Amino acid sequence: MINDQLPRWVREARVGTRTGGPAMRPKTSDSPYFGWDSEDWPEVTRQLLSEQPLSGDTLVDAVLASWESIFESRLGSGFHIGTQIRPTPQVMGFLLHALIPLELANGDPSWRADLNSSEKDLVYQPDHKYSIEMKTSSHKDQIFGNRSFGVENPGKGKKAKDGYYVAVNFEKWSDAPGRLPRIRTIRYGWLDHTDWVAQKSQTGQQSSLPAVVSNTQLLAIHTGGQR
């Protein structure tokens, strides 16, 4: 049962419906989900989100403003992305990663972009425990990490993989014939480093999330279209 004392955006955040994916790794004792049944994980996530200084409404506004500004910007001799230029999904994701921290900092200077590889993508300067990792993907409902996310790798200078995450899924050009691609889903929540599962092959380059983790620990705060 959802606690009616939580902020509206937290109460309205939606559990996912994905199926399949890799088998889940065990939770460790330092996980906020440790000892809870997976049926209770959405409420654990809601509690974690209610403690975040960055509200879901502010985050959604920053993501959508960043996405829109990609298409409004002029490059070279007046060229526009979406008209003369169609970047790869990797480049579109890079632009989101660059713009979202700037949009947030413009409204609240407590936030800034990372300055080195040991910091999260979105740094909350008053208290780094609220800093946020961003994941973007042109997949319809999944996000991916480097293979290192799914293996024990506490190497020097590596950023912590436990903590708050925002996941942004956007359309590819081929998904949007005759129009500009849109943001599919913005999800917000918490992931532990053990939630990531590396590809079994040693040559595989990706890690992914089991469906139960994706559905219950990353809750949808925006789905479909623009503002």
Swiss-Prot record:
Report residue spans for region: Disordered: 12-35
Keyword RNA-binding found: no
- Annotated keywords: Endonuclease, Hydrolase, Nuclease, Restriction system
Q: What is its EC number?
A: 3.1.21.4
Classification via InterPro entries: Restrct_endonuc_II_ScaI (IPR019069)
The GO terms describing molecular function are: type II site-specific deoxyribonuclease activity
**Reactions listed under catalytic activity:** Endonucleolytic cleavage of DNA to give specific double-stranded fragments with terminal 5'-phosphates
Q: Which domain of life is it from?
A: Bacteria
One of this protein's Pfam families, by short name? RE_ScaI
Q: Does the keyword Hydrolase apply?
A: yes
* GO annotation, biological process: DNA restriction-modification system
Which protein, by its recorded name, is this?
Answer: Type II restriction enzyme ScaI
